């Protein structure tokens, strides 16, 4: 009997350690659930958009709206203030009253409309790209028409020999002119010889010889 008594307390401690591991597993599994929720900035923008107050939503009203949505306002008070400041700096919210996180806030309608317009432009920009690509195909066909232009140019090459014949005729005509030039030179030489024959006519006053008779 004395041997069986100490064996019972030795089996008890491992049974106590098992529930501690289960608690740790629950804590580890619970952390991603908090991270899976939307960020504070999205919750703030939704709360401000849902309010119908013209003067803007105060910080107290924001906290009430966030608490109603299931957000822990007391633990995340600093996050709410940082989220408000970042949204104001980005331009999504406009601070109508107060300074910093304490005041009233409204949605910036210009920023909201500006964010919506580029999305429409992107969607519209993708559709016309296809017809532009289709228009490029006929350009390729027009490029295929270039051989036709080259075919038209070939008869011009055939016309070049005709131009060569014209040049030959032009070359022949100066030959005729060259033949005519020596004739003119001969005429000029004949004209030059005539005054030489006139010189002995001038010497006629030698008729004084009859005086000797």
UniProtKB/Swiss-Prot annotation:
Concerning InterPro entries, the annotation shows: H1/H5, Histone_H1/H5_H15, WH-like_DNA-bd_sf, WH_DNA-bd_sf
* Residues annotated with N-acetylserine modification: 2
Pfam families registered for this protein in UniProt: Linker_histone
The cross-references to CDD domains, in alphabetical order and at most eight, read:
H15 (cd00073)
Residues that the record marks as modified (N6-(2-hydroxyisobutyryl)lysine) are 23, 26-27, 46, 52, 63-64, 75, 81, 85, 90, 97, 110, 117, 121, 129, 136, 148, 159, 168, 213
Q: Where is the stretch described as Disordered?
A: 1-41, 92-213
Keywords, ordered alphabetically: Acetylation, ADP-ribosylation, Chromosome, Citrullination, DNA-binding, Hydroxylation, Methylation, Nucleus, Phosphoprotein
Residues that the record marks as modified (N6-(beta-hydroxybutyryl)lysine) are 34, 52, 64, 85, 90, 106
N6-succinyllysine: residues carrying this PTM: 97
Which parts of the sequence carry ADP-ribosylserine? 188
Which residues carry the post-translational modification Phosphothreonine, per the record? 146
- Note the superkingdom of the native organism: Eukaryota
Where in the sequence is N6-methyllysine found? 34, 187
Function recorded in the entry: Histone H1 protein binds to linker DNA between nucleosomes forming the macromolecular structure known as the chromatin fiber. Histones H1 are necessary for the condensation of nucleosome chains into higher-order structured fibers. Also acts as a regulator of individual gene transcription through chromatin remodeling, nucleosome spacing and DNA methylation.
What does the subunit comment say? Interacts with TSC22D1 isoforms 2 and 5.
Q: What is known of its domains?
A: The C-terminal domain is required for high-affinity binding to chromatin.
Under which name does UniProt file this protein? Histone H1.2
